[in-house]
Amino acid sequence: MEKYIGKSVYKGTAIGPVSVLKKKDSLVKRIHIDNTAEELKRLDAAKEHTMTQLGQLYEKALQEVGEVNAAIFEVHQMMLEDDDYQDAIHSMIQNEEVNAEYAVAVTGDNFAEMFANMDDEYMQARSADVRDISNRLVRNLSGEEQIDWSTMEPSIIVADDLTPSETVQMDKDKVLSFVTVHGSLNS
C-alpha cells in the first residue's frame, strides 16, 4: 500500500477504488498553409463551436454547482473572445502561413506562460484556464473527440491536474473524491 501526504481542500475521508486519469498530450504539427483566408474561416467555425460547448458547460455547472462556480465558463468565453488572444492567433496564421491548430497551441502557450509568471496567485491560476481553452479549441479544430465521462465507475479520481471543464463533465454521483498533483485553492 502506498501512502501520500497532501493538502486537503475539503474535510472528510473518501474510500473507494482509484481511477487514474492520464491525459495524452496532443502533438500539434506546424503545417504551411497557402490559403490563409480559408484557415481563418476554419478557426472561426471552431471558435463558435467552442463557445457553444462552453455555454453548455456553464448551464450544466449552473445546475450542479451554482452561479458562482459556473461563472468560470463565462470567464472562459471571455478569454476565448479576448482581442489580444484572437489577434495573436490570426496574425500568426496570416503572417507565418501556418495551420490554425499550431497558431492556437503556440498562442495558448505564450498566454499561459504570461499568466504563470504573474505575481498574483489568482492570476497564476488563470494559466490553466488559458491552456484549457486553447486545448479545447485545438481539439475542435482537429476533430479530436472529447473524453466520454459517462462510462466512469464510482471512484476516487487521481490526476496531475483537472480543469473546471473536466470536473463539471463528470457525473458527480460517481466521483468519490479528487486527488491532484497540481492546482491550488484558486484553481
Residue ranges and their predicted role:
Residues 1-187:
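Non-catalytic, soluble scaffold/interaction modules
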